């Protein structure tokens, strides 16, 4: 869930729109400590089917729209699950390994259009075994860098922040748990408009629709 490019099918164009980076907060650093493939993982055939939908099965694709590889990682999603370099430059096996970690964290909602099209469920994720070689993932720590402003600018910023906090205070919020994704949360809380509406309501905090963090607080869209 951020510049890279994806295969230009209707599915990938939609994924590109939902994964656009929105300014709202500055991330000075993000480090995940240890990653592990799930004890149960989807079969290679399942990943081949997903890749066929996402990129016509082209594991080394980079067409310039912010997505890479067979299952169309964004660079931020790839790095969040421990990937190095660019996804399309990694082997198919490495891409599948990182995709398994992302699927374990986010569910099939990390690929909302193609997973629904293919009818993928948790049963597909439990179809094959892989060895866990690293530590379990933990929530990402983030820090914000604030540029110093003049006294007048600071006063205006404080007023804007107070107004934003007042709006957030009136809205219902939820806290991300392990295994959550925008797709699963939208279903759980019956969000009108689905995961895309939940993403739109949290653009300031969620830069990539495929990547949310354990402990992160999200605002539920108001009906």
From Swiss-Prot:
Post-translational modification (record): May be subject to further C-terminal cleavage as the protein identified in gels is smaller than is expected.
Deletion phenotype, per the entry, is: Essential, it cannot be disrupted.
Signal peptide as annotated in the record? 1-41
Q: Which Pfam families match?
A: LysM, Transglycosylas
Molecular-function annotations in GO: hydrolase activity
Please name the SUPFAM superfamilies in this protein's record.
LysM domain, Lysozyme-like
Provide the induction entry: RNA is abundant in early lag phase, decreases by early mid-log phase and is undetectable by stationary phase (48 hours growth). Protein expression is slower; detectable by 5 hours, accumulating during early mid-exponential phase and then gradually disappearing by 50 hours growth (late stationary phase) (at protein level).
Q: Where is this region: Not required for resuscitation activity?
A: 119-223
Family, similarity comment: Belongs to the transglycosylase family. Rpf subfamily.
The name this protein goes by in its record: Resuscitation-promoting factor Rpf
